[in-house]
């Protein structure tokens, strides 16, 4: 068998905390400094950064795909841990020497 973990990157604007410059606000309302990276319970990786003008803070988000077309004979296996290890693992049969093996690509 072979296995594949896929994640996508999405850009989303973050709202700076009122009265505070140079910070992004996480989902819990905590201030995050530019360049700071953290994960949330939703299996998502966040990074606080500045846009090209240097004035606005931008939250760069990477997360697991919501859905992908699953090839015939394949299935997703749930996983746990911090991003990206919490993303489901796509497992497919791979017939090598008539054995089923798992391979991460």
Swiss-Prot record:
InterPro entries recorded: SVWC_dom (IPR029277)
Main location: secreted
PTM: Contains 4 disulfide bonds.
Keywords: Disulfide bond, Secreted, Signal, Toxin
Any GO molecular function: toxin activity
Tissues where the protein occurs: Expressed by the venom gland.
Protein name: U-scoloptoxin(16)-Sm4a
Organism encoding this protein: Scolopendra morsitans
